[in-house]
């Protein structure tokens, strides 16, 4: 599974693709170039993708399903200049079913011909997969919260995961995520349980001078290796972990309070 851009939705909720997310990714991968237009290279295998789903756009056409045979023929403009152009902000995904991941691929172009090919991963679960948060002090390793990830996925999908696949690794400036004594990767399925190659063997070692927040997105896999949802583990690397009397680690804002307190912005909730 690949997810350069990631979205989560529920079975009954239409998902609008955010054109600005694609533009930001394009700038990141091209060191600052602007996205002009894109073409789709694949469409979701599950669910339906539409252009102008709500029939409110003045650009392009009326509501139009985008299928494997038609999607590649349409050019979507980031900033359409005429009514005949198709507006990139008018892509809408309609889920079908629950507890799965699907994707759409695209190639973006700048005005001078620079291209970026990437994938949008869409997770559809009965309820959103909660973010899992851990905190550590700078230079101190922290174990991957395997049990919390399992619980978050089970709560959202009603099913237990068998393994996870990481979608992105921490930036080198932040530190290294290890599996045992080796650097982790984005192709291995790390099993839930103990032993070599398991989630419990994952640990993040921040660089000695780094403080900040690290996000580790993942897809949860069932016993067949099929994705049942995606989520994210966030690790706060702080100068010191302060104790609070007005919130606990399960409070929704604990992540933000912890990191702001470490930066001496606040002293509690």
Question: Model regions: which residues?
Answer:
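Extracellular glycosylation-rich, acidic/polar low-complexity regions of adhesion-
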Residues: 1-239
């Amino acid at each position: 599974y690949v997810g350069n851009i990631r979205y989560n939705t529920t079975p009954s909720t239409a998902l609008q693709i955010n054109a600005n997310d694609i533009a930001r990714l394009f700038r990141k991968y091209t060191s600052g170039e602007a996205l002009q237009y894109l073409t789709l290279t694949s469409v979701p295998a599950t669910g339906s993708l539409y252009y102008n789903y709500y029939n409110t756009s003045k650009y392009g056409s009326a509501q139009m399903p985008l299928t494997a045979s038609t999607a590649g023929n349409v050019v979507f403009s980031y900033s359409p200049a005429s009514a005949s152009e198709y507006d990139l902000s008018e892509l809408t995904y309609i889920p079908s079913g629950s507890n799965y991941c699907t994707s759409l691929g695209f190639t973006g172009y700048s005005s001078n011909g620079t291209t970026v090919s990437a994938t949008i991963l869409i997770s559809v679960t009965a309820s959103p997969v909660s973010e899992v948060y851990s905190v550590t002090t700078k230079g101190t390793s922290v174990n991957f919260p395997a049990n919390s990830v399992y619980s978050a996925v089970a709560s959202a999908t009603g099913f237990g995961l068998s393994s996870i696949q990481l979608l992105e690794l921490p930036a080198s400036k932040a530190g290294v995520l290890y599996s045992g004594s080796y650097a982790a990767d984005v192709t291995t399925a790390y099993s839930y349980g103990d032993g070599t190659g398991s989630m419990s063997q994952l640990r993040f070692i921040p660089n000695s001078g780094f403080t900040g927040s690290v996000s580790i997105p993942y897809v949860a896999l069932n016993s067949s290796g099929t994705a049942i949802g995606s989520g994210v583990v966030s690790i706060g690397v702080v100068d010191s972990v302060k104790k609070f009397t007005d919130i606990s680690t399960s409070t929704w804002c604990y992540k933000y309070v912890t990191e702001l307190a470490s930066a001496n912005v606040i002293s509690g909730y």
